[in-house]
A protein has these predicted regions:
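A membrane-periplasm/extracellular boundary helix in multi-pass inner-membrane enzymes
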Residues: 15, 137-143, 202-203, 223-265, ...
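Aromatic-anchored transmembrane helix interface
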Residues: 42-43, 70-79, 90-113, 126, ...
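Alpha-helical transmembrane segments of multi-pass inner-membrane proteins
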Residues: 50-53, 81-83, 122-151, 160-224, ...
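Hydrophobic transmembrane alpha-helices and their immediate junctions
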Residues: 113, 188, 221, 327-369, ...
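Long extracytoplasmic/lumenal interhelical loops at the membrane interface
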Residues: 260-275, 283, 287-327, 350
Length: 448
């Protein structure tokens, strides 16, 4: 019974982190995005959700402690955000928000260590089904809330309050349902894919379809990554050469290509924002302005950027620039080290089995990298995408660790400290015996 309650809570927490359930409670001020802490109801909901999370962390403290090593870089980045209170331009605000971002990171570690990858995808699938259904109902029955009537008239925003947020969520939903082959019933998976795709198109977001197209191209590349080294090396060189040529072509003809997509060369003003924030970055190069310490509307340092732009910017529309503004080169370095380590684990996991589940971590890491080039921010409190990143980092590291133990045959002699053989298949993608062997053979042999 307790396990069932815990699963329902995890599902509710994932939905809460989308901000879809609480968006209507934030108020009507155009600047409420910076001061949600002023809403007592939101603070109470936040305290309850993270309080329950802490209770489950304590209940499974051994798993949680074991996952801390796998989460080292992401936890260090969250703790740097907390430490930035010492030099923040708004220390009290930074302290409040950094405490919540640490709590969000803790939930990600708990979720990634508590549930194996197949179960995570099942929970995420139901999360996005609920999110997509509620957004469709909101747009159709409550169009004054669910459809943009101002800046982007006619574009759907659902319960998320902004068309790009809906497009981003539905993109992740598509990746989840695609990766859940063999985990969800086929009918449910196809229905989820179609619903998320329809809402992504109705949102009018341009970034989401472009990132989806890039992810589809990468999907074909994942098959190549499973090839033998004698095949992999020349194919990698060929693809790298092709990719470099494509980049040069895109840069050279960017105006024409963006015109085909209905975009300006400035990417709807994004390049102007990027140029404007460079001056602010250079004056706080190493440690930034503190977590959530820069963008404050017409107050503080962000007022100068807004004056240069002629409008009030809420973020840099680039996750890496936002991270640099808030935590400086130190924050960027921590994220880069953690991302590269996670990417390495994702590649190892991919080569362990052909199941689509094995490609989920790489798909999510690619989504993070591509989407944060034009949107932002990366590190954010009460944010589903940061919590999922932490969970995927932990899950991929643990899956690779179990795979390495299977390869070395150490699980047979490790005693009660190791996961039992019945638990092991949940952490690694299943595969049938073939050229690369069987990950879960009775003899404990792994792929070679």
């Amino acid at each position: 019974m307790l396990n069932l309650i815990e699963q329902w809570f995890a599902l509710l927490m994932l939905l809460y982190l989308t901000s879809g359930l609480t968006g209507f409670l934030a108020g009507d001020s155009p600047f409420h995005v910076w001061r949600l802490e002023d809403n007592p109801l939101l603070l109470a909901i936040q305290a309850v959700m993270y309080g329950i999370t802490l209770g489950f962390v304590v209940l499974h403290w051994r798993k949680f402690i074991g996952a801390l090593r796998a989460s080292g870089w992401v936890l260090a980045l969250a703790l740097l955000a907390l430490a930035s209170t010492l030099w923040s331009s708004d220390p009290a605000f930074t302290l409040r928000r950094s405490l919540v971002v640490v709590a969000t990171t803790v939930f990600g570690i708990y979720f990634g260590s508590r549930y194996p990858l197949p179960q995570q995808l099942r929970m995420l699938a139901w999360t996005f089904i609920l999110l997509a259904t509620l957004s469709a109902v909101c747009a159709l029955l409550l169009p004054q809330y669910g459809i943009d009537k101002q800046l982007h008239r006619g574009d759907w925003q659902g319960i998320l309050g902004q068309k790009n947020l809906l497009g981003k969520a539905m993109l992740v939903g598509i990746v989840v349902f695609w990766s859940a082959k063999g985990i969800l019933p086929r009918v449910l998976r196809m229905a989820g894919l179609l619903l998320c795709a329809a809402l992504m198109l109705m949102s009018g977001s341009r970034a989401a379809p472009m990132v989806l197209a890039a992810l589809l191209v990468l999907t074909a590349g994942y098959r190549i990554l499973r090839a033998r080294m004698t095949t992999l090396v020349p194919l990698t060189i060929l693809l790298l050469g092709t990719g470099i040529g494509a980049v040069f072509f895109i840069v050279r003809h960017r105006a024409f290509l963006l015109g085909l997509l209905g975009r300006e060369v400035t990417l709807t003003g994004r390049t102007k924002i990027w140029t404007a924030v460079w001056g602010a970055i250079s004056s706080h190069l190493m440690f930034g302005y503190g977590f959530s310490g820069f963008w404050a509307g017409l107050h503080g340092e962000s007022a100068r950027v807004s004056a240069m732009l002629g409008f009030v910017a809420r973020h840099a529309h680039n996750g890496f620039l936002d991270l640099w503004l808030e935590l400086g080169i130190a924050g960027l370095a921590l994220f880069a080290f953690g991302y590269l380590q996670a990417l390495s684990n994702g590649l190892r996991l991919l080569r362990m089995g052909p199941h689509r589940l094995a490609s989920w971590p790489l798909q999510y890491f690619a989504f993070m990298l591509l989407y944060d080039l034009a949107e932002g921010p990366i590190l954010r409190q009460n944010n589903l995408y940061w919590a999922l990143y932490v969970a995927v980092v932990v899950s991929a590291a643990e899956a690779v660790s179990v795979g390495r133990q299977l390869r070395d045959g150490s699980l047979a002699y490790a005693g009660p400290r190791c996961k039992t053989r019945e638990q092991q298949p949940d952490h690694l993608p299943r595969r049938t015996a073939g050229r690369l062997g069987n990950l879960h053979s009775e003899t404990g042999r792994s792929v070679a």
